[in-house]
């Protein structure tokens, strides 16, 4: 018996505006890398002890510039901004990096890479940009790159409690109050947006502190207590009977399998499903903060196809599936 295949409604996308001497010379959409998506999904649904031990949140980011696949220079991060909002039922989490290069050097570049970094090492290759024609910097020029990336999530990965209430209204003859066990079920934010912030936003506590949303409040409150930050993956599965408003919590240890296709990354959480076919499966992901502290997130609400061997499959587009036509318009 297999759990119904779920194709995630979350999408990661982004792009950049490139300026030379404050003049817009290129507008592009970026190509999200499968390695970043794998890191994101595996930190949520299940990770090895080795990966969890090396999980590190970034303190900065860098834009690496290339010409004909040869590194040219790296632009310095000068500013980071961040927004978190819900639009038409979809949660949008956007990070905008501003990079600049005012060095007295001359070069051309035709592609760029966005990397997050710690104080001592590069961490994650987030996305790429390939220009349709090279851009040129003279010694007196200043190059500025405004690079944005965004995670968008909808049901059943955001607004999980609302989703279960909708199922109750559709299939049950009477209503009752469905219990919730973790904050994101109540407030609607997605675990994918939360881990997107952790993996992509430098200095998350300082930047997110002034963005007063339920997600940022939960992250900032937890991270200020943390002596470590280690993802544990899915640690339990809750079975919801939405008609009787009853739930059972079942500790869970599953296995993770992954596959990178032409345009999509697939990661499956394989587990022994304890929920009968009349109920809904809500996996819980745990972030260990040390000293007995942790953050927990509901991953999704999924109709159960019955007890037994099951797999929750997460599918996120990358590469061409997130890429739009690129163009440059550099003047003389």
From Swiss-Prot:
Membrane topology recorded in Swiss-Prot or TrEMBL: Single-pass membrane protein
Main location class: host cell
Compartments reported by the entry: Host membrane
This protein's UniProt keywords: Host membrane, Membrane, Transmembrane, Transmembrane helix
Annotated transmembrane regions: 185-205
Protein's name in the database: Uncharacterized protein 53
GO CC terms, sorted: host cell membrane; membrane
